[in-house]
Every structure is written in structure tokens, then in C-alpha cells.
């Protein structure tokens, strides 16, 4: 799988398309490569990461509407996590990603890209990856401000019991009750649990329903599999085309699910 994700890499570290091209750009390939455990010193991965930083860390004017910066923070979050896992946390451009996330964080703890004038609630989709990125940055550098910001986002997820409206108690999106792989930037309960686990909050009582849901997703053969909407496809052209075939990803999802089960052992309701 790792070889397939690195196939077609150019001498400059790119893959012949924009880094954010879905899903063959370097940005997305790197997220998957890091999830698969590619060694931090891998030269090909680091070269690809430099092309991502050249793009994402370029100066740009913040888009602020009614005092709230509107940002696709999943971009910075994923890039930040990848670079930290590849041993690049001390790169000044990586610090720039942290500064952008800290600056753009909304009062409720998350981020949002929507331009609606009345938008006041963060997007779970845009807030998931920043948790990962900020936690990885803290692990690499000890930066406490990054960890504090990630914890505020974790509280946002927990306040919604991982997938419910804090106002009505209803499920926000039925798709969030499924496991997706790769999930790219999309939120679901499984990746939400992985995020709060990074923060040491997996045993919080507000995550109890999501933990129980994870148990119910275990199949008779002892595996967990992708069951939700498939965000990728194979092909030669167009958006949403992947470099590899993931199938139901049970060999990747199962160990991740088992890690969550072990970490939550003894948690109450």
C-alpha cells in the first residue's frame, strides 16, 4: 500500500498534480502514508511534505466575517500532523500552520470555512484534523498552547456526545454513525473517538454512547470495516480518484478500533 501511494512521484517530490488534488495530491497521499506508519525519516515522504508546505504555508489574507475567521482548517490540521510525524516540526513553515490554527479558532473551540453571515457554530469536519495536528505538534515540541487549543476542540466534540446536537439531542448526520476509511477531512464517530483518545479524554462519560457504538460495529469475525459512504474511487481522471484501492480497509481499521477498545477499558457510562 505504501509503495502504491508513492508511485509516480516526481523528482521535486510532487505527484504531477496540485498537492491538494483529491485524492492523488501529495497532501492526501501523505495523510494515508503517515496513518500507515511510514518511517519518519523516509526521504520520499519528506520531499512530498516540502511541496505541501510550499503551498499551504504561503502568505494569504485571512477571510474574516463578523469577527470570525473562515478557514478550511482541516488543511492546516492534516499538513501539521503529517509534518510533525515526519520529524519536520521545527520547520518555520510548520510553526506558521500552528499560528494560523490558533488565530482562527472559534470561541466554541473549533473552526469553520462557511461564509454565512450568521454562522456561529464550528464545523466538526473542519475541526477534526486540527486536533490531530496540534496534538502531534505538542508531542514533538512540548508546546502547551497547541495542546490547550486541541483540548478546547475535544470539549466541542464531547459537548455534542460525539455526534448529537447539543440543542435537540438528535443525531447531527446519520453518516457520522458509520466508519469511513480513508475519511480524508470528513468527520464520523470513529475518528472522533480517535481524536479524543489523543487528548486522554476517551473515558469521558460524554463519549460513552460513541464507545458503545464502536463495540456494535465489530463483525462476527472480530474485525471492523468501513461501512459508510465511500469517498474515493479508482479511475484515471476526475476528482475523488485514489492512487490505491482501499476496499473495506479492515486490516487498518481493526487495529485502530482494538486500540480504542483497550484504551477505554473500565470506562463508565
Per-segment meaning from a language model:
Residues 1-269:
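Preference for long, amphipathic alpha-helical scaffolds in soluble/luminal domains
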Amino acid at each position: 500500500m505504501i509503495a502504491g501511494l508513492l508511485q509516480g512521484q516526481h523528482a521535486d517530490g510532487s505527484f504531477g498534480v496540485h498537492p491538494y488534488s483529491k485524492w492523488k495530491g501529495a497532501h492526501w497521499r501523505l495523510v494515508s502514508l503517515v496513518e500507515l506508519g511510514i518511517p519518519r525519516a523516509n526521504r520520499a515522504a519528506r520531499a512530498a511534505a516540502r511541496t505541501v508546505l510550499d503551498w499551504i504555508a504561503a502568505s494569504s489574507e485571512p477571510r474574516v466575517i463578523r469577527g470570525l475567521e473562515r478557514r478550511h482548517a482541516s488543511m492546516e490540521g492534516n499538513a501539521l500532523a503529517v509534518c510533525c510525524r515526519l520529524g519536520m516540526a521545527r520547520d518555520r513553515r510548520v510553526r506558521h500552520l500552528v499560528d494560523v490554527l490558533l488565530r482562527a479558532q472559534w470561541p466554541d473551540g473549533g473552526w469553520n470555512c462557511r461564509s454565512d453571515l450568521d454562522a456561529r457554530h464550528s464545523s466538526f469536519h473542519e475541526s477534526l484534523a486540527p486536533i490531530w495536528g496540534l496534538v502531534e505538534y505538542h508531542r514533538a515540541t512540548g508546546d502547551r498552547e497547541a495542546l490547550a487549543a486541541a483540548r478546547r476542540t475535544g470539549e466541542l466534540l464531547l459537548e455534542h456526545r460525539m455526534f448529537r446536537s447539543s440543542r435537540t439531542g438528535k443525531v447531527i448526520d446519520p453518516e457520522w454513525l458509520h466508519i469511513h476509511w480513508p475519511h480524508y477531512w470528513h468527520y464520523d464517530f470513529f475518528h472522533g473517538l480517535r481524536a479524543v483518545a489523543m487528548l486522554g479524554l476517551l473515558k469521558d462519560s460524554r463519549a460513552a454512547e460513541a464507545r458503545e457504538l464502536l463495540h456494535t460495529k465489530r463483525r462476527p469475525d472480530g474485525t471492523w470495516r468501513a461501512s459508510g459512504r465511500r469517498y474515493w474511487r479508482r479511475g484515471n481522471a476526475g476528482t475523488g480518484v485514489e492512487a490505491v484501492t482501499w476496499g473495506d480497509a479492515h486490516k487498518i481499521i481493526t487495529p485502530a478500533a482494538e486500540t480504542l477498545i483497550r484504551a477505554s477499558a473500565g470506562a463508565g457510562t
